[in-house]
Structures are given as structure tokens and as C-alpha cells.
């Protein structure tokens, strides 16, 4: 059974989705139903015209990117939503990169 995680205005939700090829991260304000910031391997791929693989290194880069975007918007604390995936591998790499950039959850 899946538990619903909801963010607040002061503490939005960092939602992570992992597919076989890509990883996506979104900062969502659930009170207004708005996506505040987003980052994925597809966005980084199109910006840099480089091939980013689906490994932990790519997840670390996405974590750094979403953390920089959230700091630019003044967001210091988030609620981490890993969508019932285990805290391991790419999910863990993304979370650690976000924490290294100074975002708390």
C-alpha cells in the first residue's frame, strides 16, 4: 500500500521518478498544485549535447542541478518523495547530492 506524501508551501516535495533509462526530479508545491522546478537526464542531455548514462553519476548530477535550482528559488527544506522505491543506487546518489548542496530533508 502506497503512502501519500504531501508537501507544504514552506516545505515543498522533492519527487523522484526512476525509469530504466532516465531519472527525473521535480520540486512540487502541493498546496497550489504547481511544479516549481524540474531536472532530468533528458534536460541535461539536450542542454549539453552529451550522452549521460543511467548510472549513479548521472543521478548525482541531477541532484546537484535540482538543488541549485531550488536554492535559487529560496527553498532550503524539502520533503523527499521516492515513490515507494528503495533508498539505494540512483535514488541514494540523487539524495546525497541534494544534501551536499545544502538542502535539508
From Swiss-Prot:
Subunit (UniProt): Part of the 50S ribosomal subunit; contacts the 5S rRNA.
Pfam family name, one: Ribosomal_L18p
Matches recorded under SUPFAM superfamilies: Translational machinery components (SSF53137)
Primary subcellular site in the record, as a coarse category: plastid
tRNA-binding in keyword set: no
Function in brief: Binds 5S rRNA, forms part of the central protuberance of the 50S subunit.
Biological source species: Gracilaria tenuistipitata var. liui
Gene Ontology BP terms: translation
Listed InterPro entries: Ribosomal_uL18_bac-type, Ribosomal_uL18_bac/euk
CDD domains on file: Ribosomal_L18_L5e
Family, per entry: Belongs to the universal ribosomal protein uL18 family.
Keywords tagged on the record: Chloroplast, Plastid, Ribonucleoprotein, Ribosomal protein, RNA-binding, rRNA-binding
UniProt-recorded name of the protein: Large ribosomal subunit protein uL18c
Amino acid at each position: 500500500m502506497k503512502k501519500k506524501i504531501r508537501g507544504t508551501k514552506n516545505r515543498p516535495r522533492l519527487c523522484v521518478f526512476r525509469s530504466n533509462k532516465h531519472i527525473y526530479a521535480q520540486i512540487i508545491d502541493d498546496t497550489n498544485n504547481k511544479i516549481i522546478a524540474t531536472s532530468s537526464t533528458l534536460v541535461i542531455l539536450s542542454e549539453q549535447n552529451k550522452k549521460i548514462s543511467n548510472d549513479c553519476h548521472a543521478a548525482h548530477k541531477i541532484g546537484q542541478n535540482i538543488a541549485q535550482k531550488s536554492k535559487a528559488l529560496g527553498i532550503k527544506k524539502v520533503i523527499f518523495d521516492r515513490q515507494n522505491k528503495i533508498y539505494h543506487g540512483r535514488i541514494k546518489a540523487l539524495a546525497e547530492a541534494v544534501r551536499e548542496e545544502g538542502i535539508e530533508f
